[in-house]
Amino acid sequence: MRSPNSDLDHRHPALAPLLEAGFAPGRLEQVLAFYDEPHRAYHDRVHLREMFDASITLGVPLNATQGLALLFHDAIYVPGAARGTNEMMSAQLLRVYTAGLERSMVDSACSLVIDTAEHIARSQEAELVLDLDLMRLAAAPLDFDRYSRQVFAEQRSLIAIADDTEALAFFSSRRVPFFQQLLDRPWVYCTPAGRKHFEAPARANLRRAIGVKPYAYGNG
């Protein structure tokens, strides 16, 4: 059952440019159903809704291409898939669901989806999409820990360690290189809004995650 806070439909103001570009509300509901799959604990409709909400509250409106990319960026999520595979399949799904829409917009949206695999912006349009995708890194510490446990829950069946505490420690250690890679960048976030609102708390969370081994998750 979805949380009331996960409600996302064609009435959301951030989706208006996408719908005005010809993406049908019925197709929108079909895509959103992918985010309700039972194996998802983090990459779900709540995550998606938060990103669209943030584009409104931060005053950084999405254009149709960016909205399309956000909508599809985690549409396919198979835990344990090789890096980039989920994003590539999500981009392929995007093409299936956008037959008849402007070709250049679809091509650009697919490129943005693929950029989310490495979180490297290869165009200016990608910058806002990537910032919104990484916004949870800047959550309050207890929320950051909760999100980390949600990702762990999605990966748990792939970790051949019976003890949950040991499995969590192993999972945490596997995330360190990615977190360090983000910290080594001059900026974690690309846009002025992302740097203003997310940069400092995200770096604090990432340093904490890397500095404590095994990672001491909060109870919140």
Regions found by a protein language model. Give the residues of each.
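Divalent metal-dependent phosphate-bond-processing catalytic cores, especially two-metal-ion Mg2+/Mn2+ enzymes
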Residues: 2-3, 11-14, 36-43, 53-62, ...
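An active-site-proximal "capping" alpha-helix that borders the catalytic cofactor pocket
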Residues: 51, 85-100
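Short, well-structured alpha-helical segments
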Residues: 25-32, 45, 49, 67, ...
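Alpha-helix N-cap and coil->helix boundary residues
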Residues: 26, 62-65, 85, 104-108, ...
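His-Asp-centered metal-binding catalytic motifs of divalent-metal-dependent phosphohydrolases/nucleases
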Residues: 51, 63-80, 90, 110-117
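Amphipathic alpha-helical interaction segments
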Residues: 58, 78-82, 101, 120
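Hydrophobic/basic alpha-helical segments enriched in Actinobacteria
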Residues: 17-24, 56-58, 96-97
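Hydrophobic, proline/glycine-rich low-complexity stretches
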Residues: 2-29
